[in-house]
């Protein structure tokens, strides 16, 4: 059993937390942020997640009390090898409106592949320079990052492990993230990923905004992802005087710098700009108890809003186990043409509308206004099913990244692992129309 299996967490979404490593319980200053001399010879450093003048209800920042300030490092140099399958530049990619489905992305075939070594971009839209957009990536690895940390200057990472637990060390402390859990690492926070074996998963990256809980409207004060179930790390530090590599994703490109100490030297911190995790199995599902199929927005876990009210740069939506009991209703998802782009992934089990070709570790993209919906077998079965109450999606967990932006498929993903027969899922659908007599 690893130390990570025994971790304790701070609870609550967006809370104003305060924590010190138990080895130095008085690390935080009392009544101020930046004393003339911090206790134990620590340095005070603020990490800003929003503009200073953002409304107080939206303002995000944390104060870190660390052994050395982050500014102690040698100059950054470009890392060309990391740009091979990664991009945040979608403007030059040819458009492609077809339905796409990818088979499970392969695990590494050679040893020593870390999280940061094997990140590859599937699709995305927007722009990191103007800081409005998103990108969807996959990762696969089989080795831990040793004396290496990374951070994203462009935006937030929402990490969805599909196979293998991730032991994530951050400046704020440590997180154990298992499949069917997610982690969010906000912009600028340094972190390192250790694994226990072959691991893979998905990443939703957003720039120019942060994830927040969706409004509940008429649902009321409770439901969906409850704030109390989000977990942030307690302070933990290491005082290591060894060479570390700091990897920085900046304007969609990769850079690295060397420094002579661990970046995970924060002895205490307070604030509301933090990394966090969430167990998807704790999601409280809302569904119809009368008739018709509810829109998938009722399954939203987190949203990254755009400047247009009610419209997201990205929503993170899940389809967890639940009861289906709608009367006189076609219960699977309906046929749809959407003004949003929909990327789907599968963590475990099978997806209710496509039980055959959609496998854990794979994905699908239905671009803006591209038709999609249940395959032939699903339609035939659901149209003739006995409409008794039954469990839906039992033993499965699928998810969707939905965006108001057009998404371009990268040149790499157009050809890699593609299910070229995906369109055939709908070809057997029959004409059932009969004219009235």
Curated annotation (Swiss-Prot):
Primary gene name: hgo-1
GO molecular function, one term: homogentisate 1,2-dioxygenase activity
GO BP term (any one): L-phenylalanine catabolic process
Pathway the protein contributes to: Amino-acid degradation; L-phenylalanine degradation; acetoacetate and fumarate from L-phenylalanine: step 4/6
Catalytic activity annotation: homogentisate + O2 = 4-maleylacetoacetate + H(+)
EC number: 1.13.11.5
Keyword DNA repair: no
Mutant phenotype after disruption: RNAi-mediated knockdown together with fah-1 RNAi rescues the impaired growth and fertility defects in the single fah-1 RNAi mutant.
InterPro entries, per the entry: HgmA_C, HgmA_N, Homogentis_dOase, RmlC-like_jellyroll, RmlC_Cupin_sf
Organism field: Caenorhabditis elegans
Region (Disordered): 15-34
Name assigned to this protein: Homogentisate 1,2-dioxygenase
Tissue-specificity statement: Expressed in the hypodermis and intestine.
Cysteines paired by S-S bonds: none
Enzyme class: oxidoreductase
Signal peptide (UniProt feature, chain positions): none
Parts of the chain that traverse the membrane: none
Reported impact of residue 173 to R: Suppresses fah-1 RNAi-mediated toxicity
Annotated binding of Fe cation, by residue: 336, 342, 372
């Amino acid at each position: 059993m690893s130390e990570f299996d025994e971790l304790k967490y701070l609870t609550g979404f967006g809370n104003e937390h305060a924590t010190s490593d138990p080895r130095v319980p008085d690390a935080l200053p009392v009544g101020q942020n930046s004393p003339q001399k911090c206790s134990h010879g620590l340095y005070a450093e603020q990490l800003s997640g929003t503009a200073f003048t953002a409304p107080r209800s939206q303002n995000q920042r944390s104060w870190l009390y660390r052994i050395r300030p982050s500014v102690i490092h040698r100059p950054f140099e470009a890392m060309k090898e990391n740009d091979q399958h990664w991009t945040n530049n979608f403007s030059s990619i040819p458009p492609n409106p077809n339905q796409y489905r990818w088979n499970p992305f392969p695990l590494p075939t050679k040893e020593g592949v870390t999280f940061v070594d094997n990140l590859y971009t599937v699709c995305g839209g927007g722009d990191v320079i103007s800081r409005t957009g998103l990108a969807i990536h996959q990762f696969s690895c089989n080795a831990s990052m040793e004396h290496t940390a990374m951070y994203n200057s462009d935006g937030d990472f929402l990490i969805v492990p599909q196979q293998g637990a991730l032991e994530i060390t951050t400046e704020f402390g440590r997180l154990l993230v298992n499949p069917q859990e997610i982690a969010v690492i906000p912009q600028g926070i340094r972190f390192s990923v250790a694994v226990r074996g072959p691991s893979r998963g998905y990443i939703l990256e957003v720039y120019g905004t942060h994830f927040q809980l969706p409004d509940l409207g008429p649902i009321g004060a409770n439901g969906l992802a409850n704030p109390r179930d989000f977990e942030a790390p307690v302070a933990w530090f290491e005082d290591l005087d060894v060479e570390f590599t700091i990897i920085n994703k900046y304007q969609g490109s990769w850079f690295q710098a060397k420094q002579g100490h661990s970046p995970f030297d924060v002895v205490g911190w307070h604030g509301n700009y933090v990394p966090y995790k969430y167990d998807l199995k704790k999601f409280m599902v809302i569904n119809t108890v009368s008739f018709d199929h509810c829109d998938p927005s009722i399954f939203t876990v987190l949203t990254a809003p755009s400047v247009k009210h009610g419209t997201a740069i990205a929503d993170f939506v899940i389809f967890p186990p639940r009861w289906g009991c709608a009367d006189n209703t076609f219960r699977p998802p309906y046929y749809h043409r959407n003004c949003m782009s929909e990327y789907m992934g599968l963590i475990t089990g099978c997806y209710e509308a496509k039980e055959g070709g959609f496998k854990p570790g794979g994905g699908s993209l239905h671009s803006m206004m591209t038709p999609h919906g249940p395959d032939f077998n699903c339609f035939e079965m659901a149209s003739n099913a006995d409409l008794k109450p039954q469990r839906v999606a039992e033993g499965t967990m699928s998810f969707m990244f939905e965006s108001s932006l057009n998404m371009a498929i990268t040149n790499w993903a157009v050809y890699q692992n593609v299910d070229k027969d995906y369109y055939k899922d709908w070809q057997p659908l029959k004409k059932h129309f009969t004219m009235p007599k």
